Amino acid sequence: MIVVVIIGILSTLAAYGVRKYIANTKTTEARNALGRMASAVVIAFEHENMASPVLGQGTSTALTRALCKSATKSVPNAPTAIAGRKYQSSLADWNTDAATNSGFACLQFTIDQPQYYMYSYAANGASQPGDSFTATANGDLNGDQALSTFQITGAINSSYVINVAPNLLEVSPEE
């Protein structure tokens, strides 16, 4: 009888451990994607743009660096698309803002595999010290309408360099 009880306890613990392991592997998608997105923000910011397309001989113009403007839509655009399931995005989802060279199109960021998370990008300002960005991944792995949130932020410092947060903010990561 004691053996049956011990086996029952061990199987319960094993089921819990496997569930935690599976949830952790799914959250890896959000962590990796946000890291890639933060790198894309830095690369886009460091890409210098001239204010004038053609310069006359003997003249100069200022080079500008700017954060990509905010994305107008998340991918996917509603949390119901990722509630307890995966979403297969299309290139059109990521290029919604291509006409204005903003959002994910400006970052040249896409995910071509099925995804558990809804991604968004927001910029606060463009090129001055203190201007910042936030990249967010929201998920609903168990389909209970309660979203998990992963965020990474960065800001332009006084030397006009982007400082990216060393850690992700994670709220209810296994939700």
Residue ranges and their predicted role:
Residues 1-22:
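N-terminal single-pass transmembrane signal-anchor helix
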Residues 98-126:
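Intrinsically disordered, low-complexity regions enriched in Pro/Ser/Thr/Gly and acidic residues
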Residues 23-34:
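Membrane-proximal amphipathic alpha-helices
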Residues 21-24, 44:
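Amphipathic alpha-helical segments that mediate coupling or scaffolding at interfaces
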Residues 50, 140-147:
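Acidic, glycine-anchored loop motifs typical of Ca2+
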